[in-house]
């Protein structure tokens, strides 16, 4: 799969590369989050250093819980996927961007996202969200047949991110909406299971960062600051 000239990435000899998706550090809102330690690669230095994270970030997401499992080798058809979703939560996919920048090639984040994921304490059922159902964005090119479903499958959910500095007042950093998501929850579940992967009741799936089309609607500091190039007023 890889170019023989670059068979090993520079981080291969420094980190036991892996990809991490885990439930052990999913915590409820209000649980303290400790700044993670890890390897970071500073500019103009040949080797990484072990350090506390210097670029701790949030990711504004939602998540959904599987309510009705599917068996191994029995994929969930996209048109019936919503019937297997119990409900939604708010989700903050905490991210250590400097750890992530060093470790993510070639498999993706590992320690950069494993230290905490915060979810809201209440699950909102899809029945309760029915009045907010709306049409999802147009998908071009048309998805492959296993990812197709008829009708509206997005939800008009207004979302905000506020940051309160110690001793200060909350400042709103972003305003966005769940309806901007390109892929629906039904498509996400259908794709997750299409290979035959089984799910269990209680499995949690995150939406990915929810960002809108305009500045001020981006769901992470990475995007809001253009990776540190643009200040954000707090």
Predicted segment positions?
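Active-site microenvironments in enzyme catalytic cores
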Residues: 1-174, 183-186
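Active-/binding-site microenvironments in catalytic and ligand-binding cores
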Residues: 81-82, 167, 173-175, 208, ...
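Active-site pocket scaffolds in enzymes
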Residues: 183-191, 198-201, 205-234
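Secondary-structure transition/capping motifs at alpha-helix termini
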Residues: 168-169, 195-199
């Amino acid at each position: 799969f890889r170019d023989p000239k670059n068979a090993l990435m520079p981080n291969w000899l420094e980190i036991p590369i892996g990809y991490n998706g885990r439930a052990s550090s999913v915590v409820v809102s209000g649980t303290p989050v400790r700044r993670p330690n890890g390897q970071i690669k500073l500019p103009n230095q040949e080797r990484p250093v072990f350090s506390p994270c210097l670029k701790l970030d949030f990711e504004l997401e939602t998540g959904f819980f599987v309510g009705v499992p599917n068996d191994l080798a029995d994929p969930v058809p996209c048109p019936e996927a919503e019937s297997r979703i119990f409900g939604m939560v708010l989700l903050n996919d905490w991210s250590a961007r400097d750890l992530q920048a060093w470790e993510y090639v070639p498999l993706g984040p590992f320690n950069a996202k494993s230290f905490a994921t915060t979810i809201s304490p209440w699950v909102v059922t899809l029945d309760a969200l029915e009045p907010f159902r709306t049409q999802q964005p147009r998908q071009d090119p048309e998805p492959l047949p296993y990812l197709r479903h008829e009708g509206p499958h997005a939800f008009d959910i207004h979302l905000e991110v506020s940051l309160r500095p110690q001793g200060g007042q909350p400042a709103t950093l972003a305003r966005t909406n769940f309806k901007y998501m390109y892929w629906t929850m039904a498509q996400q579940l259908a794709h997750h299971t299409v290979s035959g992967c089984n799910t269990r009741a209680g499995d949690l799936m995150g939406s990915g960062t929810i960002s809108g089309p305009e500045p001020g609607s981006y769901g992470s500091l990475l995007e809001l600051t253009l990776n540190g190039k643009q200040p954000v007023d707090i």
